[in-house]
């Protein structure tokens, strides 16, 4: 515990709040190119093959991002738009790919929560 005299000499420093999605550099989304598209397994109590992609962003960073929804058309060299938001059961995956933007197609036959998956309104 510092004395009052010590606090006068050197006041307390405020804690620095770090962003949870630093590589976006305070932007809402960033564009990038897929360098690898693959599946991976989640942490302990869960079991699945989660679709993820390694993306090289326009600022030079390379991040792992999650591909939401059922089936996708992404492959190497696809241009994608990513947003922040981690996947709780995939360590190291802190970004999501936006569906229905740039080279990513929306989810087919999606009826509810369509805007999150880039699906057009069914006729």
From Swiss-Prot:
Gene Ontology terms describing biological process: translation
Alphabetical list of PROSITE patterns matching this protein: RIBOSOMAL_S12
Positions of the UniProt region annotated as Disordered: 1-28
Gene3D superfamilies according to UniProt: Nucleic acid-binding proteins
Pfam family, one: Ribosom_S12_S23
Keywords: Methylation, Ribonucleoprotein, Ribosomal protein, RNA-binding, rRNA-binding, tRNA-binding
Superkingdom of origin: Bacteria
Annotated SUPFAM superfamilies: Nucleic acid-binding proteins
Assigned GO CC terms: small ribosomal subunit
Basic residues composition-biased segments: 9-21
Positions bearing 3-methylthioaspartic acid: 89
InterPro entries according to UniProt: NA-bd_OB-fold (IPR012340), Ribosomal_uS12 (IPR006032), Ribosomal_uS12_bac (IPR005679)
GO molecular function, a single term: rRNA binding
Family to which the UniProt record says this protein belongs: Belongs to the universal ribosomal protein uS12 family.
Function statement: With S4 and S5 plays an important role in translational accuracy.
PANTHER family: 30S RIBOSOMAL PROTEIN S12 FAMILY MEMBER (PTHR11652)
Subunit organization: Part of the 30S ribosomal subunit. Contacts proteins S8 and S17. May interact with IF1 in the 30S initiation complex.
Protein name: Small ribosomal subunit protein uS12
Organism per entry: Dinoroseobacter shibae (strain DSM 16493 / NCIMB 14021 / DFL 12)
Name of the gene this protein is made from: rpsL
């Amino acid at each position: 515990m510092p004395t009052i005299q010590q606090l006068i000499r050197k006041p307390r420093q405020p804690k620095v709040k770090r962003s949870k999605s630093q590589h976006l550099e305070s932007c809402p989304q960033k564009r990038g190119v897929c360098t690898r598209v693959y599946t991976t397994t989640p942490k302990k109590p869960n079991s699945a093959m989660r679709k993820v992609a390694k993306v090289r962003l326009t600022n030079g960073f390379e991040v792992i991002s999650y591909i939401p929804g059922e089936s996708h058309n992404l492959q190497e060299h696809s241009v994608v738009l990513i947003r922040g938001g981690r996947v709780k059961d995939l360590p190291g995956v802190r970004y999501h790919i936006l569906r229905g933007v740039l080279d990513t197609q929306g989810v087919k036959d999606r009826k509810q929560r369509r805007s999150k998956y880039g699906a057009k309104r069914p006729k």
